[in-house]
Structures are given as structure tokens and as C-alpha cells.
Amino acid sequence: MKPSFMNPSFQKIIQILNGGGVIIFPTETLYGLGCDATNPQALLKIYAIKNREFGKAFPILVKDFKMLSEYAILSAEQKKAISAAKKPTNFVLKAKNISPLATKNHTAAFRISSGSWVKKLFHFFDKPIVATSANLSGQKPLSDSRQYREVFGSKAELIDAAIFTGVNRKRSGSRIVDLTSRPYKVIRK
């Protein structure tokens, strides 16, 4: 196990993210496997860790509408749809300034996170964060970040830190709504 692997300080987490590292962290839905969404090397690590099909886009967390507008092309109508969401929802939008490894056809699924831990992270980290479920592609999501070695096996060595908040995350994933289609299309409920 790496030094300060479990529950490192926010300062250490920022160093990891800025250095192209990967973390397991709590979101408002599931535990996420995350990295700096603008860093291609970090994204390649997540593809490897998850055994994910190359070219499949990742969900991306942003701090607020200001950050969202830096990384997505956003109309007033789309902003209104995002503001009206009653539960955690990823919205597919045209992406900009994001690594092409995080997008598909120049689109990505963005979410303004309501998770308390993620909100704290955004006080220190001012870039979008990939937040794909912490699991191998096609498998059940991790419900306890301390079980990462069981889930990821030898690929666990590619993970730089895990944050455990004491809450087992057995919720379902977030909704996905495509705002690039007319009418808007619900991809996952």
C-alpha cells in the first residue's frame, strides 16, 4: 500500500490529481474512479484500470456553471434543463478544452456535483474531474473504497489514493440525459 493511500489530505489529493494520478472518491451517488479530465495520461490509466473499451466517454464532474461553460458548449435552454434536475444527472453536451480521451464524438456527460466531499475538493482543485464508477467495466460498482484490491486486482497498483467516508455507497448511478439531441433524450434513468 502506498504511503497516505487511505484518506489522504486534500493537499495530497491535489498533488495526485495535478501529477496525473487516479483516486477513488465518494460522490453523491457511487464511489468514483477519478482523475483530472484534462490530462490524457491520467485518462489512459483509468481505461487500463477499468478494462474499459477505448473511445467510450467518461462522466465529468464540474464545480458550477462557470466551470461547465469553460468545458462545454452550453445554451440558455440547456442551462435551464440542468438547473431543473431534481436528482444527480449527467448531461451530454458538446465538449471543449477536455482531453479527447474523455469524450466521444466531441461530447461528454457533465454533472455539477452536489456531493459534499466533491464540493470540498473543488475548493482546492479548479479543473473538471472524471468520475466513472469505481469498478471493472460491466461489473458491479464498488460499495466500499477499502475493497479496491479485491475489485481491481493487480490493476489496483495504478490507483494512487482512496477516500473512505464511512458510508457504503450502494445507491444507483446517476441519470444521463443527452442535451445534444432534439428532443432531449434520457439515456439512463
Residue ranges: model-predicted function:
Residues 1-189:
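Active-site-adjacent structural elements in enzyme catalytic cores
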